[in-house]
Amino acid sequence: ALQWYRPFTFTCEWGNKSLQSRNIPQWLLDKDLWIRSKGVTDTVMAAINKTIDFFGEGIGVHTYYWHNYPYDTHYPDYFPAKPEFEGMISTIQKRKCHAVPYINGRLWDPAADSYTALNGASASCRKADGTLYTEIYPTSKVLNTVTCPASSLWHEIIIGLADKIQNELHTNGVY
């Protein structure tokens, strides 16, 4: 992949710009330390605060398990977020750190409401025999379809989701 994919990336709009000419916030370029939080609980928030106390401001907090559904299920239906999540984000930001929640940008759970409502199968990758590519992870044991990254439907969903996360939950970005 290194021999063909890396050179290919430099021919694409998203890969041919230098870091200096990309629209990357300075805080992200300056980030020295990222921590991963798993959940929205008092215990998790105490651990985040303890880490900030020790290392100081400027930490990036990469948040997982912030949504109401079990992990690796109901993608991309992340809303509503857990009720405490917005307060967690606010606390992190008041301590001069940045919060960036995780979303899965390639899987769509056929059990998600959006899969039926938006005809998720139409945006899913298919094998040569026409069947869907699917994956099951040990975190959930739920079958998910692999979504075509070139699908205009999927672009709309992911862009809308990223906008909603940043605008309604006031995060510093989305991973």
Predicted segments — roles?
Residues 6-9, 70, 116, 134:
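Compositionally biased, intrinsically disordered low-complexity regions enriched in proline and serine
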Residues 22-27, 62-66, 135-139:
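Short amphipathic alpha-helical segments, especially helix-boundary/capping motifs
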Residues 35, 74-76, 148-149:
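Short, contiguous strand/loop micro-motifs
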Residues 38-40, 64-68, 104-108:
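Active-site beta-loop-alpha junctions enriched in small/polar residues
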Residues 67-82:
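Surface-exposed, active-site-proximal loop segments in enzymatic domains
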Residues 83-91, 98-171:
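Active-site-adjacent "subsite" loops/lids of carbohydrate-active enzymes
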